[in-house]
Amino acid sequence: MIKALFNKNTALAAVAILALSGGAMAESAKTHKTDMAKKKVSELTCEDFNGLEESFKPTVVGWVVGFNKKGKEEDAVIDVDGIETVTPAIIEACKQEPKASFWKKAEAELKKVF
């Protein structure tokens, strides 16, 4: 278990930087990631989440776990095992409905695990 306090602005910046990093990409992928970096997390779609590197998806899910329903950061113990359990469920839910709100899909799956 890891004790972590997430800062929303720092997390958003990290998501944007990591989403935009990488080697050579097709122009459409660059455009998609640039558009994603401009969105608030509450505006992200499952399609945006699906476009992330597989290895980064648990990090995004962990960040979502670190916020309560009011969008405020919490001083909480992060359940790494829980994140590893719920991440595949969120990935599958987002594959089923790519146009759906990522935040809402993540919250629904998190309620099943936490």
Swiss-Prot record:
Give each disulfide bond as a residue pair.
C46-C94
UniProt signal peptide = 1-26
Keyword Chaperone in the entry? The reply is yes
- Major subcellular location class: periplasm
Where does it sit, as one GO cellular component term? outer membrane-bounded periplasmic space
User: What keywords were assigned to this record?
Assistant: Chaperone, Disulfide bond, Periplasm, Signal
Highest taxon, organism lineage = Bacteria
Subcellular localization(s) per the UniProt record:
Periplasm
Q: Which InterPro entries match?
A: HdeA (IPR024972), HdeA/HdeB_sf (IPR038303), HdeA_sf (IPR036831), HNS-dep_expression_A/B (IPR010486)
Which Gene Ontology terms describe the biological processes this protein takes part in?
cellular stress response to acidic pH
In the record, the note on similarity to other proteins reads:
Belongs to the HdeA family.
Task: Relate the protein's function as given in its record.
Answer: Required for optimal acid stress protection. Exhibits a chaperone-like activity only at low pH by suppressing non-specifically the aggregation of denaturated periplasmic proteins. Contributes to acid resistance. Not required for wild-type virulence in the BALB/c mouse model.
Q: What is this protein called?
A: Probable acid stress chaperone HdeA
Species in which this protein is naturally found: Brucella abortus (strain 2308)
